Swiss-Prot record:
Keywords: Chloroplast, Cytochrome c-type biogenesis, Membrane, Plastid, Thylakoid, Transmembrane, Transmembrane helix
UniProt function note: Required during biogenesis of c-type cytochromes (cytochrome c6 and cytochrome f) at the step of heme attachment.
InterPro entries documented for this protein: Cyt_c_assembly, Cyt_c_biogenesis_CcsA, Cyt_c_biogenesis_CcsA/CcmC
PANTHER family: CYTOCHROME B_B6 PROTEIN-RELATED, HEME EXPORTER PROTEIN C
Membrane topology: Multi-pass membrane protein
Protein family membership: Belongs to the CcmF/CycK/Ccl1/NrfE/CcsA family.
Gene: ccsA
Protein's organism: Anthoceros angustus (Hornwort)
One Gene Ontology cellular component annotation held by this UniProt entry: chloroplast thylakoid membrane
TM region positions: 6-26, 37-57, 71-91, 97-117, 142-162, 247-267, 281-299
GO function terms (MF aspect): heme binding
Chloroplast recorded as keyword: yes
Name of the protein: Cytochrome c biogenesis protein CcsA
């Protein structure tokens, strides 16, 4: 009873903290640019990750088996994976846009598991003999991280496509690389307009007459303001492209190991390596899409929009494979949730 109460407490805390972090990241992007507020969001996710880890360990100790036997447990493991992805990406990028996307998915996943699923599906059950296999641990512990990484990568490339939607019309600077010196001036806010000393506006005001100086000063402000926006947008698109490719590559690795270990497990349980189960078929489709994306990045050297268009379809396919195929009471992977 104590373990069950502890599990419920950890479940509610680990849902509230990603919700708080989502509000913090959105607030920092929209209206409040404060590093202390941003650190509050990151600390909330770290604490949520610890709470979910404690929840999983508590439930594991209570049920005496790996927590991957039903939809509720897989959702909790999925939320745990999303939090871990955010922590790793935050260490590497320091970009709140990644936090907005990843933390929001973690919150929705955790909320659906605790609120959307019936109480009966949240109870721990005894594993059937076919599931009592070490290959099950290998298979599911690889597939769940692939469910976390592949949708994250796909959502990042969707954000990339939205960011560069009208770049040829409104953001011509995105067509070429920007000198690193300009990057350091603009992105670190060392390029001031309208200040004192040796800045542009003061040199203009000391070398010309009134109206001409005002006109030139306004033109300079508009030009460099546009340049600053375009450079920041270029930096954002480069980070989205960088992280989406690496996250999708990591997800493809998890998916490959999961498919191979699943084939061995199915052969042990039912005597066949591949049975064209609905989820097996959609797993193969997902693997082919991710393989095409990695191939055109590594072999053809494509970057930006072209591989992003291919990868953008991965998010909907992965979620359909996870929920749409799992929900009906058909197939070896079914949880029968809709029934």
């Amino acid at each position: 009873m104590i373990l069950i109460n502890l599990e419920h407490i950890l479940a509610h805390i680990s849902f509230f903290l990603p919700f708080l972090a989502t509000l913090v990241f959105w607030g920092r992007i929209v209206c409040i640019d404060n590093k202390r507020i941003g650190s509050l969001g990151n600390k909330s996710i770290i604490i949520a990750y610890i709470c979910i880890t404690g929840l999983l360990l508590t439930r594991w100790f209570h049920s005496r088996h790996l927590l991957l036997s039903n939809l509720y447990e897989s959702f909790m493991f999925l939320s745990w994976s999303f939090c871990l992805i955010h922590i790793v990406s935050e260490i590497g990028s320091k970009n709140d846009w990644l936090g907005i996307i990843i933390v929001l998915i973690a919150m929705l996943t955790h909320g659906f598991a605790t609120v959307g699923l019936p109480i009966e599906m949240q109870q721990s059950t005894v594993l059937v003999p076919a599931l009592q296999s070490h290959w099950l641990i290998m298979h599911v512990s690889m597939m769940i991280p692939s469910y976390a990484t592949l949708p994250c990568g796909s959502l990042l490339v969707i954000a990339l496509l939205i960011t560069t939607l009208n770049k040829n019309k409104n953001f011509p600077i995105l067509k070429f690389n920007v000198n690193s010196f300009i990057w350091s001036l603009i992105l670190e806010k060392k390029f001031y307009l309208g200040g004192s000393g040796g800045d542009i506006s003061s040199r203009n005001s000391s070398s010309g007459n009134g109206s001409d100086n005002d006109s030139n000063n306004n033109n300079n402000k508009k030009t460099f303001h546009s340049l600053s926006i375009d450079c920041r947008k270029l930096q954002l698109t480069q980070q989205l492209d960088y992280w989406s490719y690496r996250i999708i590559s990591l997800g493809s690795l998890f998916l490959t190991i999961g498919i191979l270990s699943g084939a061995v497990w199915v052969n042990e349980a039912w005597g066949s390596y591949w049975s064209w189960d609905p989820k097996e078929t959609w797993a193969l489709i997902t693997w082919l899409l991710s393989a095409i994306h990695i191939h055109i990045r590594m072999i053809r050297g494509w970057q930006g929009e072209k591989p992003a268009i291919i990868a953008s379809s991965g998010s909907s396919i992965v979620w359909f494979r996870y929920l749409g195929v799992n929900s009906p009471e058909k197939g070896l992977h079914s949880y029968g949730w809709l029934n």
